[in-house]
Amino acid sequence: MKLKNIHLYNYVVIYTKNCEIYINKGNEQVYIPPRMVAIFEKNISFNIETIRKGDGVLYESFDMKHELLTSLRRVIEPSVKFAAESYTNKRSFKERIFKVKSCSIVIDLFKRLKDNGSPEFTAIYELAFLVSKCENPSMFAISLFSSVAVTFSERIVTLLFSDLTRKWKLSDIAEEMHISEISVRKRLEQECLNFNQLILDVRMNQAAKFIIRSDHQIGMIASLVGYTSVSYFIKTFKEYYGVTPKKFEIGIKENLRCNR
């Protein structure tokens, strides 16, 4: 199945249990083979293609919570040192996805972390072990240290997610953050973003999650993410992801279930 415009707002860890994945961004492509764990940096977007390679669930994943990342940074920090320019050098898209040298221990740790099977203190060190098995642990450390802070756009995303049924305007964001509209616009421009695209990304991200994780009808989902017209929601969804909500639902839910 192929999907466009996948946006990640958190670090995501994925295990390609019964599939291979092709990630595309511009002219760059990342291939993740079957039965591999990989870590995706937050605030990236890409197109994705999944190809089944066995029976059962295609892949499993979980988001890394901000608190866990902050603790992970404290654990890693004493053991790594980088020149100042390491944090300012532009990294390619490929350098924002970290493949983990997978073995039975790594896969077991992935499952424990996904299922919250360990106390928080233990989970931090389990995650640190997982990271140490990355193909390029130093590059992951640079990623972590560079992005652990909450950006301005992330603060807006959190605000938008708090009530997607609201008809958000730039003036609403300015009022909530106690700054001017011009300041909001300029600070988003510094991150190469604009408000209209950001709110579209957030609405479509949440719509996809509702389709995957709930039994809501398309009309209900449209309303929950701020659309009064179901037909306009369907049109927007198709333009954004490259498939209609119904085809997305059929494809995703069939692929996530056991292949019969």
Curated annotation (Swiss-Prot):
Keywords: Activator, DNA-binding, Transcription, Transcription regulation
Domain of life: Bacteria
A GO molecular-function annotation: transcription cis-regulatory region binding
Residues annotated as domain HTH araC/xylS-type: 154-251
Pfam families: HTH_18
DNA-binding residues: 171-192, 218-241
InterPro entries documented for this protein: Homeodomain-like_sf, HTH_AraC, HTH_AraC-typ_CS, Tscrpt_reg_AraC-type_HTH
Record GO cellular component, one term: cytosol
SUPFAM superfamilies in the cross-refs: Homeodomain-like
Subunit annotation: Homodimer.
Function per UniProt: Positive regulator of the expression of the 987P operon for the fimbrial protein in enterotoxigenic E.coli.
Protein's recorded name: HTH-type transcriptional activator FapR
Organism this protein belongs to: Escherichia coli
Lineage, uppermost ranks: Bacteria, Pseudomonadati, Pseudomonadota, Gammaproteobacteria, Enterobacterales
Gene label: fapR
